[in-house]
Amino acid sequence: MSTAPTAPTVAELEEQERRLVFRRFTNDDAWALGSLLVELAREREAPVAIDIHRAGQQLFHAALPGSAPDNDAWIARKRRVVERYGSASYLVGSRFRAKGTTFEESSRLDPDAYAAHGGSFPVTVAGVGVVGAVTVSGLPQVEDHRLVVEALERFIGE
């Protein structure tokens, strides 16, 4: 029996985005959210890099043991998808797959610059819209996505 997490549906991913909205998002919020992600990743001994951007500025970055420079490249590629589409990188990739194609085949975007793989989630502020992205890289894409969502659920629920 497989213990791999089941991939969420497009509807489930869209519901996460509707739910996980901030009232505001400050530099201090980025630090607190990033620190929570580090704590969750350390509990799991996850070899990840974590990044939070807002309005083109990096507000938080951490590279945990076992992560590599490639994780930073993946972070940039996933974040660009969020910035371009205004949706989670995993949701964007899932929408392409639901249409019987892939992001790489059909987006017409450079795969060296964009990756619609799980792990980058929009920072959305109520009444404003998407202002940034929180991104994790180092695990399989479903797990990267789930780690970010878990942190957002805990943080926004506080």
From Swiss-Prot:
SUPFAM superfamilies: GlcG-like. It holds the Pfam family HbpS-like. This is UPF0303 protein SCO2848. Belongs to the UPF0303 family. It comes from Streptomyces coelicolor (strain ATCC BAA-471 / A3(2) / M145). InterPro entries: PduO/GlcC-like, PduO/GlcC-like_sf, YBR137W-like. It comes from the Bacteria.
